Amino acid sequence: MANLVFICASEGNNALLAREVEAHAVAMGHSVEHVSLNEYDFPIYTVAREKATPVLEGIDRLVEVLDRGEAWFVFAPEYNGTCPPVLNNTIAWLSREGDDFRRLFRDRVVALGTHSGGGGNHVIMAMRMQFSFLGCVVIGRSLLTNKKKPANPDTINAIPVSYTHLRAHET
């Protein structure tokens, strides 16, 4: 089975959703490692700050964890119709690592999920565009939940199965 990295862009309901999905993924034989982007607390990315910061504390550790994942599941709330700032900022810093900004992302299988106050469709669309642009293979089915709509167990189970199917086609 796959080594999965669950990336959380919030500590609240999205972290709880990630734990719920983890239980299903582990029951299917996958291993799961969690990354909380808030724990890294990277400064806001700017070109000037990048030049002034030859070594960004924590970035190597984050790259190492993300590299271990054969696939990622990104959980993020919707902020003003798009991704939360911590996700955009982290991606900005990650894309500046090394000579090839897509190296970490290229051909990486990515699933998307959200627990949002609204519908969550906008953050899913924004993440789908961003991760696709970076070279990821984004799974078509997404997990959208909110206070009135609990996580769909069929979707929770279908997404880890998608990882398995995609890996089977790689060999």
Predicted regions and their residues:
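Cofactor-binding loop segments of dinucleotide-utilizing enzymes, especially the Rossmann-like FAD-
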Residues: 9-10, 37, 115-117
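Mobile beta-alpha loop/short-helix "lid" or hinge segments that flank ligand
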Residues: 35-43, 133-151
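Active-site-adjacent alpha-helix of alpha/beta-hydrolase-fold enzymes
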Residues: 22-25, 130-137
